[in-house]
UniProtKB/Swiss-Prot annotation:
GO terms for molecular function: carbohydrate binding. SMART domains: Jacalin. CDD domains: Jacalin. This is Agglutinin alpha chain. D-galactose-specific lectin, binds the T-antigen structure Gal-beta1,3-GalNAc. Changing K52T: In minor forms. Transmembrane segments: none annotated. Keywords: Lectin.
Amino acid sequence: GVTFDDGAYTGIREINFEYNSETAIGGLRVTYDLNGMPFVAEDHKSFITGFKPVKISLEFPSEYIVEVSGYVGKVEGYTVIRSLTFKTNKQTYGPYGVTNGTPFSLPIENGLIVGFKGSIGYWLDYFSIYLSL
């Protein structure tokens, strides 16, 4: 896949991504907060089509992500992110995608998620997060 690195900002306002209920997570585009102003990061798109769009608009700054979870598994021989769930201090969004494979969970006990990086090919291969403490 193609690696991406959005860098770190001052918060997250909106998360847009795509999923397929039979395969995995596709593209990802995040609207961050940059010192009180929205900043739309680059659209990291899948190489293929056939996904359903998801738009998660957070009530920034009072709503923030406290956990990212999901499933990792094989699709056509590739290990990819098959499912994503975003839990905020107010509600849970998801799960989106295929909830089977190896589960993962990134609970955030201290700090805020302020950025994403990862790799996307046909599907979201992997991602990691930037934290602000």
